[in-house]
Structure formats: structure tokens, C-alpha cells
Amino acid sequence: MARVLVIGDVHEPVSHPGYRQFCVDLAERWGTDRVVFIGDLLDFHAISFHPTEPDASGPIDEMDEAAIRVRAWCTSFPRATVTIGNHDERVYRLAASVNIPGRFIRSYASLWGTKGW
């Protein structure tokens, strides 16, 4: 029987500071052979359709910080399966709302530097 570590709602770059290490420790402790992220690896607070925190980082700073953290997750779990959550797809929804075709949007792996995801 497979041992699957399911990781949800990371919300980078604002995840709990110890969340990644906690997940790494769980994977090692239980000898997991598969890791699945079940959505919302990213937060994208700066481009939310909801009211945003005025003192929060802007979209470029948020993306730069998220990229560093997402690559760390990818280093920890290089063969993970990543599903797209509603926060992850905010860029696609925002682009569609102003008629930007999907082919102009970079792939997940290309954007975040997560080869294999």
C-alpha cells in the first residue's frame, strides 16, 4: 500500500515558518513514497479579487518571495504531484478577465523554476 503525504494550503509566501520542515519530517517519519500538493501552494494576495491588506507586499515582491519558497518546496519534494487550487489560478483568471489568451501565460514549472512539477 502506498504511503502518501498530502500537503494542502501552503499559501506561499505567507505559509507558517515551520510548515515545510514539518512536512519533510512527516515524510521521513512515515516513509512516504508519494507527495501530493492539493492546491493553494501560492497565495497571490496582491492580485486577489477580494479586498487586500494595504501594508502587504505588492505583486512583484510577493512573487519574488514566493518563487524562493516554492523552489525550496520543490527541492524538498522533487517528484511531488501538484494540483492547482483557486489561489494558484488567480493569474489565469485575472488574465482571462481582460481577454489575455492562456497561451500568453507561462507554465507552472517555467514560472516558478520547479522542473518536474
Regions flagged by a language model, labelled:
Residues 2-3, 7-116:
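Core catalytic region of metal-dependent phosphoesterases/phosphodiesterases
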